[in-house]
Amino acid sequence: MQRLHQQRGDWPALIRLLPELRKDKVLPAAELAELERRAWGENLSLAAHQEADGTVGLQTLNRAWQQLSSAQRQEPQLVLAYAEQLRQLGAQVEAEEVLRTALKRNYDSHLARLYGLVRGSDPARQLQLAEGWLKEHPADPSLLLTLGRLCLQSSLWGKARDYLESSLRVQRNPEACAELARLLAQMGDTERSNQLFQEGLGLLDERLLAAPLPVPSHA
């Protein structure tokens, strides 16, 4: 039944089944915990795309978030899912507040990356806060990418370039390549910009080639 719900994408039904799975110890504890996180994360996505009173589902998303226990609302994977849905719904300020609170409580690289994609009510404070995290996480490429993006939002072109180049020194990443390429193009360095765009595309190709593909069926 559990696999059937997964295959159908019926995450609310799977969530209702979780107590029984936990009681019967059908799955190892770690696997069950991961399944539970995925189910609740997918449920947040479903809630965000429901329509209520003619508006796409900010209210239903928030209701789904409140259904989680206080412990679950502190899990980085679920905070990430919630904040991403808030961002997609245009609730940028709310998304920034959720991420800021979570990152102050417990730093997480995935949350730090998303923090650079949201626009809070005070961009200068947002940048200052992220620079504070850099003291304890100086080699996190996701945080360096976020700092580059926050500097771009504040038109701090030189600092943005430094942070993006630092991110790429730690890890070659298509997102950082694209952001730095865009910046360099605006600064007139078209040759290096084109090189970075090409590198970013190559890195994306590597990710696609590494992804599993279905085995072709033979008639």
Predicted regions and their residues:
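TPR/TPR-like (Sel1-like) alpha-helical repeat modules
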Residues: 2-27, 96-109, 168-174, 182-209
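Register position in tetratricopeptide repeats
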Residues: 7, 88, 117, 121, ...
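Alpha-solenoid helical repeat scaffolds
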Residues: 16-19, 62-66, 80, 100, ...
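Alpha-helical adaptor scaffolds
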Residues: 40, 44, 49, 97-169
